[in-house]
Regions:
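Residue microenvironments linked to proteolytic maturation
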Residues: 28, 66, 91-168
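Short, surface-exposed beta-strand/loop "edge" segments at domain boundaries and coil↔beta transitions
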Residues: 37-46, 77-82, 109-117
Length: 168
């Protein structure tokens, strides 16, 4: 895939999915995901330069440490995170070559944990993952772009907000 994603068939996620299919809602739903890549165009034609994406990833690590790394289901236009739409928390990020990887914890409700009742965005995402749906991950941020041929290069004023779950 050319964009970030969470794949239920990824070997890193197989043990998580096996546990979740046993319907033990007491355990958190945690997954590994490709969050973003530098130096290659994504599906919307944007290219993130290495220097800019690494700078923003380092800044985002501070948000993770403070518990401020929430993200939403779907990808709103707003630069603000809407707590009614929060679906997951990024708990760790790291580099694998030019790929920014992450560990996500879906924020599910007590009703989902106790009875499988879907009532929050995190519940929806958890239920989709349990059913084997591959979801996309899209970085949300603000900043300018510069046209370079067919691609839009993200500029130095870019500020990363979060990594939303989207349809792939």
């Amino acid at each position: 895939m050319d964009a970030g994603y969470i794949s239920p068939s990824d070997p890193l996620n197989e043990s998580f999915l096996k546990e979740q299919k046993q319907m033990d809602y007491r355990n958190p739903f945690e997954f590994y995901a490709v969050l973003q890549k530098f130096g290659v165009p994504n599906r919307n034609g944007r290219v993130y330069p290495e220097k800019i994406l690494k700078r923003e990833a380092d800044r985002y690590k501070t948000a993770i440490k403070k518990g401020l790394s929430t993200s939403e289901l779907n990808h709103p236009e707003s630069s603000l995170i809407d707590l009614d739409r929060v679906a997951h928390l990024i708990t760790d990020i790291w580099w694998d070559g030019h790929i920014l990887m992450g560990k996500l914890k879906l924020l599910t409700s007590p009703g989902f944990h106790e009875s499988g009742i879907v009532s929050t965005k995190g519940d929806i995402a958890a239920n989709l993952m349990r059913q084997g749906v591959t979801m996309g991950v899209s970085s949300r941020g603000v900043g300018s772009l510069a046209k370079k041929g067919e691609q839009n290069e993200v500029q130095d004023d870019f500020e990363l907000i979060c990594f939303d779950l989207v349809s792939s």
